[in-house]
Amino acid sequence: NRRLPEQQVVNGTPEFWSIGYLTDVILTRDPWMHRLDLARAIGRGPVLTADHDGVIVADVVNEWARRHRRPYRLELTGPAGGTWGSGTGGEQIAMDAADFCRVVSGRPGPDQGKPSGLLATQVPF
């Protein structure tokens, strides 16, 4: 799989992305996040489903967990939510699934403040 010529910096670490990662992952997540942004801008909540949005959220959670590599328990609420975890004794997080994705994308809402702990681990969108 060919890689892009320039490095991307994620969580302070430079990394190379493959063209496949860009087309299969980023070009799915980015428009999805814009959908959430537009819904927020017009004051309407997005209509999320487990079948579509839940798959994107699960993909984000799995990459987030691979990036931080620490024990955790995550409970995401809403139609796109679910429960994930790895290891024991780790941080426990409970929040809305769409808010989780906003936070780990580096675009928390004004009421969410600066992320800390495992939520400071960003995932590319």
Task: Name each model-derived stretch.
Residues 1-125:
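Structured surface interface patches that mediate subunit assembly and partner/cofactor docking
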